[in-house]
Amino acid sequence: MSVDSEPKPASPDARAGTTAGVLPLIFIGVLLAILTAVALLSLTAGDTGLVNVYGLTVTRVLAEIGSVLTVGSLLFAAFMVAPKKSGVLEVGAYAALRTASWAAVLWFFAALVSVVFNEADAINKPVGEVLRSDLLFTLIGELEQPKAWLVTAFIALVVAAASRFAVSWGWTATLFALALFGTLPVPVTGHSSAGGQHDLATNSLLFHLVAVSLWVGGLVALLVFGRRVTTGPELRLAATRFSATALVCWIVMAASGVINAWVRLPVSDLFTTSYGLLVVAKIAALVVLGGFGYLQRKKGVQAITDGGTSGALVRLAAVEIVVMFLTIGIAAALSRTPPPGVGEVPDAVALQLGYTLDGAPTLLRLLTAWRFDIIFGTLAIALAVLYLLGVRRLKARGDAWPVGRTIAWLLGCLTIVIATSSGFGRYAPGMFSIHMETHMMLSMLAPVFLVLGGAVTLALRALPVAGKDGPPGPREWLLAIVRSPVSRFLTHPVVALVLFVGSFYVLYFSGLFDVALDKHWAHLLMNAHFLLVGYIFYWPVIGIDPAPRRLPHLARLGMVFASLPFHAFFGVILMSMTTIIGERFYQGLGLSWANDLLGDQQLGGGIAWAAGELPLVIVLIALLIQWARADEREAKRQDRKADTEGDTEREAYNAMLRDLSERS
């Protein structure tokens, strides 16, 4: 008779052996990525500036490898293994955190050197000439890519320094989010950010790069640090979580890669241009990686789940890592190769917005001229689907969930889609008045519906509880975010109010809006800011979910009324201004049906002044209903207390009378 037993932790020799085997593999992968990028560029680069081209390519490969290793190590430390009950990282997670620090150092230096190479490449000058002159600092202010590399270098430096001191789960998760954000500045200012359809190209590329960072970095971290944890439950947990992450990443990479190639490359150029051949090579590598991912799930992860052995995982991942780094090399060469037709200049509207605007924004066009926003449209759909799955899980176990909350959440998601993907989203970058309408929808309407949906409460009820001895999961991570000092600070009434109303004045009256108008990534940040700040403001006011700060209903009402004059004054200022905000950008578009820029701005001011009325009505109704229900619950509680304990005040009074009667 056999007895199942818990697998024993790997011995130090076994762990060292695994690490010693993986590190040379990583070195070979890095070298292969560099050689691949250089070799492919030798087929496509011209005769001038080869040192700059190759230098920038090599430093870009090193920066990307440093970034994915940083992200992957932090992913492993924060989410693949459980911390101690005190919140301090376990040994394997701590080792991953320290490795992230060193990887971020590589990322920092490679990004910093890329600033110089990028400037030299942009003006076709030797690197030495750029360093010896005052061009180095002058070009940073004039060129987008050097600025992006400098921002990336700064983020990498912060992550490298902070990772040396962090020991808790909270700080590790924060550094993971920061590192992931640090991978974005460079790609949003590259090929995908210019020319026709650059909005679709940029949005899909952001998804693509995040997925690459999580998949490649996560796999390397799992191999290097997984054995430091144990071959028992912790390793199984890490392998299972990474397997699920890898599957999602592969789907995202495939979908976003197809979209990016589709907007950049006609099918006829797929096999007849250098850019097309590089795309084909990258697609082939992605298919191979998908095959290895499938084998990992079927053999490697399954073997760990069944018996705790990681041999199959290591063998498959070894080849997978090599292919991954080869793909990074192809991607680096692709980023340095102009797509076909890059010399063709589209009209001013398509050049600035990525698409054309066919006539004035009539009501019919606003409702029918859709252009799906890959980021916010996908986000809204994902939020709606996850919410409905949570409701279905509750109903499957017999728990009720109010229909009104579901309707509110779906209306919030629909508002996001309409604001970013309908004709409103299409015309918003080209007209100030339409932009203000989307601004109001994202900051004052969608958040109202979302906070009334109570998604956090739904998630806490639907997600499994880790238990006393179980590893923290999504439910515990969500609770940590809600209870974090950052959430408590942001939901302070004064802070929330200042963020909500102050953002209007800072963005439009400081010159930031003028600077941001011709940058697609800036529009993405504005939309995200509007939505997030609106949610932060309305959450403690009418939110169903428990906020870090529970305010009395009178204080909530005060927050709402305190914001009204600031919104009204903002709209009045816009309507009375004679200076046109973003005048040069809007004039450059040359829209024949939008010549009256001042009138359009005044219309936008009127929208800002009046648009708060409908959300205000919804907020006041919701707040008064919640107030009445809270009073009703309190009255019922007092009644139950009286029924169970008796009317203590009346009994005390009667006892006093009896006592007086006896004395007399």
Please tell me what each predicted stretch does.
Residues 2-372, 598-603, 607, 614, ...:
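Polytopic transmembrane helical bundles with strong interfacial aromatic enrichment
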Residues 11-15, 77-97, 220-241, 262-271, ...:
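Juxtamembrane membrane-water interface segments of multi-pass membrane proteins
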Residues 54, 60-61, 68, 111-118, ...:
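Early transmembrane hairpin module of multi-pass membrane proteins
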Residues 66, 188-193, 197-227, 260, ...:
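Functional transmembrane alpha-helices
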Residues 111, 180-188, 255, 413-421, ...:
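Aromatic-anchored segments of alpha-helical transmembrane domains
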